[in-house]
Amino acid sequence: MKIDIFDTTLRDGFQQEGISPSVKDKLAIAKLIDELGVDFIEGGWPGASPKEKEFFDTAKKDLNLNNAKLVSFGSTRKLNTKVEEDPQVQALIDSQTEYVCIVGKSSNLHITKALETDVDNAISMAVDTVRFLKENNRKVFFDAEHFFDGLKENAEVTLKILDSVVNEGVECFIFCDTNGGTLPHEVTELLNPIIEKYPDQEFGVHFQNDNGCAVTNSLAAVNLGVKHVQGTMNGYGERTGNADLCTLLPNLSLKMNLETVPEKSLEKLTPIANHIAELVNIAIDSRHPYVGSSAFTHKAGLHASGMSKDNTLYEHINASQVGNYTRTTVSELAGRASVITKAKEFNIEFSNDEAKNLIEQVQNLEYEGFQYEAADASLYLLMKKIKGEEPEFFSFESFRVYSERRNSQNVVSEAVCKITVEENRFVTTGEGVGPVDALNKALKSALKNNYPDVDKIKLTDYKVRIIDSSDGTEAKTRVLVEFTDGEMIWSTIGVHENLSLIHI
């Protein structure tokens, strides 16, 4: 059975606090979502703001989607306004998308208190808008706002609205759990008789995640025969978010064996999810199902030992099916099997003696405050050192960094680095908003002649922890930093009493 995937990241997902993408970012994210192979991408509300209008105006010219249909979003006509005179309805026409999605009230409480009108007017608003859009050759999706709450409050009113809209011939009628409070068993109880009554009508679902059940509710609806599912990448959305497509897609495809996106496209899920996270500047939770960095990570012990024999012993799917990868962390508790498995991840062949050597070094370093579980790049270099293969890209001679306050206002840091790269000595300076920024600029300045790609590297995460606060200002500090060059992500760790030395 084919399930239509309707992505609403660009509209409902971006109602999340802290997300305010530019038009350029929205266009880039639309291309990424299209690459995933979804059926529909809801671009936004063209009548809502100049930025939304600019997005659709630009999309007409420059957004070439290979898989998805772009959908514009709006609402039913305003109360006491003719549909042909409603500017936000006209904006839907002007967006020139083949598909439009309109939202309308389906709860008696919202009709009487939010709209301050009666059911007949609410039905007229919905019917007029659907009819007008269809007369203008648009294919219409209808988001029935507060549908589940409406059924619980006054089912007669909600079902009357449903019947009126369905009779207008909408492409899909979407049951919306706008407040996100519906439970899975309620989905079955409330929707089953409706789906049976309208066997020829396509239905969809849109669940908010306020009670943590958005994905589960979506799966329950699909089990009833719903063939249209809405959600957002990484679960973005207002309050606690929407049904998360990064969890929903693998569950539908790999667990329920339903047709959603192409298999090869699903294998891009993790990198696409991470790329979108970078564009909106909100890191994915490491423990996020399927796409998190820890989703297929195994710590030393029985799990890691079992994984060295057969991945299926401790993984419910092959990580590569969603573009992720299996990872084994190494800590002071690691055994030789775990170390050898981890080395293979780096394409390094370790003997038992070398594994024993690494374990001893990790134990000693962790006693000093290091922690290698989240610092694969540092662990890789340690393994290379044990193999006698540690690369030397440059040799460090010295550095100096200081900060000063200028004009009684700004504090500026300056750094001087002296390094040798392939027998060429460089003395470079850098000025930044702090010591770390200044050192970073000075070091990049010295390296970019031989390694021009260093300009692509940027800091994406930075964690500082004092190891033993009883030592006061002389305490050792652990710094874990994460970098990316736009394609790969890696982490390194440093421990010292001097913060500047750690950063170098």
Language-model features and meaning:
Residues E52-S75, S124-N136, L190-V205:
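Alpha-helix-loop-beta-strand connector modules within alpha/beta enzyme cores
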Residues I5-T8, I41-G43, A68-G74, V100-I102, ...:
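Hydrophobic faces of well-ordered beta-strands that scaffold small-molecule active sites
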Residues P21-L36, K82-K113, D118-V140, F147-Y198:
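Alpha/beta enzyme core
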Residues Q88, G212-L224:
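Catalytic cores of alpha/beta
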